[in-house]
């Protein structure tokens, strides 16, 4: 197996196959569930808006893949600093049956100098998730934070407040996951000594098998080849799947989605 094939198979099994579009429908989510079951294995999860969780749960069960996890988003995509709203959305997502919640960190508040609201918001959502045995990923929106110091600070605050994963991006801003921001975030995980309990998720902009290989190489360099399993690493993507399947000898590499 070539290096690209090997990394593509790894990446496929680490994907949070995503649709977060304004025109999402039950039919599109059902199709996403079907795509998550591939000839070479299943994706780790799908990521969808909360209202689609029940139909996704039903579809995954019916197609014989009940262990594909269902992730959703809250405080999305703007990362506002209203803790009550973020918490209410997170509780609603849990009530819908989410296995994982990806909450947006109040990154604009951090840029303006307010570190406390980010901690408090993540902690409130973590408490709700922990009580329901739901995984919490925190989206820090690296493409808007821009500066290394802010990316580092948002990562640190999120981890201190209980994040199970730190995630680069919503996919809704001009700059999403980059190898540079990925390295900064994973270095925080390393420097804080939390690599056993905290994972990393690049999202948006990871579109090709070669992209995925680059992002995995950074994880392997920092933590060794065995760290990036589905409890410690995810790719938030949709168009990536077709490229991975093509690298693995399935399909033509074309995708219907741009995330």
UniProtKB/Swiss-Prot annotation:
One matching Pfam family is DeoC
Domain of life of the organism encoding this protein: Bacteria
Give the E.C. number(s). Answer: 4.1.2.4
| Keywords (A to Z) from UniProt | Cytoplasm, Lyase, Schiff base
Give GO terms: molecular function aspect only: deoxyribose-phosphate aldolase activity
Catalytic activity line of the entry:
2-deoxy-D-ribose 5-phosphate = D-glyceraldehyde 3-phosphate + acetaldehyde
Q: What is its main location?
A: cytoplasm
- Where does the protein end up? Cytoplasm
Task: Name the CDD domains for this protein.
Answer: DeoC
User: Biological process GO terms, please?
Assistant: 2-deoxyribose 1-phosphate catabolic process; carbohydrate catabolic process; deoxyribonucleotide catabolic process
Q: In which pathway does it act?
A: Carbohydrate degradation; 2-deoxy-D-ribose 1-phosphate degradation; D-glyceraldehyde 3-phosphate and acetaldehyde from 2-deoxy-alpha-D-ribose 1-phosphate: step 2/2
A Gene Ontology cellular-component term: cytoplasm
Q: Has UniProt tagged this entry with the keyword Cytoplasm?
A: yes
Give the annotated active site.
Answer: 102, 167, 201
Q: SUPFAM superfamilies from the entry? A: Aldolase (SSF51569)
Check the record and name the HAMAP family matching this protein. DeoC_type2 (MF_00592)
Function, as annotated, reads: Catalyzes a reversible aldol reaction between acetaldehyde and D-glyceraldehyde 3-phosphate to generate 2-deoxy-D-ribose 5-phosphate.
Stated family? Belongs to the DeoC/FbaB aldolase family. DeoC type 2 subfamily.
Q: Per its UniProt record, what PANTHER family does this chain match? A: DEOXYRIBOSE-PHOSPHATE ALDOLASE
The protein in question is named: Deoxyribose-phosphate aldolase
> Could you tell me which species this protein originates from?
Salmonella typhi
Identify the gene encoding this protein. deoC
């Amino acid at each position: 197996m070539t290096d690209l094939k090997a990394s593509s198979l790894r990446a496929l099994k680490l994907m949070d196959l995503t649709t977060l579009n304004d025109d999402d429908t039950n039919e599109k989510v059902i199709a996403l569930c079907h795509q998550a079951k591939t000839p070479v294995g299943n994706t780790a999860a799908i990521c969808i808006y909360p209202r689609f969780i029940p139909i996704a749960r039903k579809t995954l069960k019916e197609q014989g893949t009940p262990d594909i996890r269902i992730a959703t988003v809250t405080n999305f995509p703007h990362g506002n600093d209203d803790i009550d709203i973020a918490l209410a959305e997170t509780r609603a997502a849990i009530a819908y049956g989410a296995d994982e919640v990806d909450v947006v960190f109040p990154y604009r508040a951090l840029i303006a100098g307010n570190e406390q609201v980010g901690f408090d918001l993540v902690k409130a959502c973590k408490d709700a998730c922990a009580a329901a045995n739901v995984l919490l990923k925190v989206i820090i929106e690296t493409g808007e934070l821009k500066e290394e110091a802010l990316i580092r600070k948002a990562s640190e605050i999120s981890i201190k407040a209980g994040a199970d994963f730190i995630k680069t991006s919503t996919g809704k801003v001009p700059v999403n996951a980059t190898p540079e921001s990925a390295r900064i975030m994973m270095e925080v995980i390393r420097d804080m000594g939390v690599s056993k309990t905290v994972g990393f998720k690049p999202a948006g902009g990871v579109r090709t098998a070669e992209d995925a290989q680059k992002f995995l190489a950074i994880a392997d360099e920092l933590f060794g080849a065995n760290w990036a399993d589905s409890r410690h690493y995810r790719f938030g993507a949709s168009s990536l799947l077709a490229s991975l399947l093509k690298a693995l000898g399935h399909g033509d590499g074309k995708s219907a989605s741009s995330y």
